[in-house]
Amino acid sequence: MSAPAILAEDLVKTFGDVEALKGVSFEAQTGTVLGLLGPNGAGKTTALRILTTLLRPDRGRAEVLGVDVTEDPVGTRMSIGLAGQNAAVDENLSGRENLRLVGRLTHLPSAEIKHRSDALLEQFDLTRAEHRLVRTYSGGMRRRIDLAAALVHRPPVLFLDEPTTGLDPRSRTDLWGTIENLVADGTTVLLTTQHLEEADRLADRIVVIDHGEVIAEGTATELKGRLGSTVIEVGFGDAAGVARATEQLARLGAISTDGHQFRLSVTDGAAAMLETVRALDAAHLEPLTLALREPTLDDVFLSLTGHAAEVPTPSEDDDEALTASRRGRRSGTGGVST
């Protein structure tokens, strides 16, 4: 197998008394999508910031395209693109002006800047808004121009930190299609997300991080397969019902709870469902809902972290990362496109 396009090996990073990363390791092969999953504060953004030269690790190794990012940060920045939760383009410039600015900062010839700007504005359906100030753009348009800016210099590696946070379903689906097209053309993508459907659709491999440690990794199919072939989902009107049902059904399989609902992972769905109904009836418990279905990444996330995925919101870490990126671009010290 060829060398990975992205490599993190035993990364350690502390902030005061907080251990953000505790020996995190993962890799992404060329032309694939690696999804980093985890709750807020798990360490996903910290790992991404190290790989994109915005933070130095306390220990460990981080490489992009075989280059140690701490030894050659400027070269690394010229070979990657970065788009975060919040669009980092200049709101007081037009869409086209933002793309031209990134082109100049990454030292592209004038003709190439125009060619790339034309192509990206068309690709992201922004030609009709190219001369409007970005501050007049909708949330979906801002996310698209931000991603376009990250692609001006044709980076072979793209880092996306919660790229669809705050987007409506249609805009999210459109952006997924764009990412899929980039990967089909050979781009390597590292994607952090809490949208489990997003990881299920896009990621070739998934790494789950919690409390600064890798707690699971594999394909979506492999991760879901660890739970068993079927999930029985039971809902009650209160937490007391969940607690009583858990006592009755723990013998049937692995149980995870979430508020007024619990999920039972089993290998023989039909037999386990029959046993579930009998046990609930014997305990005089009447659930509001009872369903039998295939496991999802949400079940995996709940089983591994102890709670369901949160609604993604922009984090302070991400704001700091993008601010640092802007400083680098405007001072001419780097070419991270955000």
Where are the model-predicted features located?
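A generic structural signal for short beta-strands and their flanking turns/coil linkers
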Residues: 78, 228-232, 286
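Short, surface-exposed acidic/glycine-rich loop or hinge patches that mediate macromolecular interfaces
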Residues: 67-70, 131, 214, 239, ...
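Short phosphate-engaging motifs
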Residues: 20, 198, 241, 272, ...
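ABC transporter nucleotide-binding domains
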Residues: 3-8, 13-210, 216
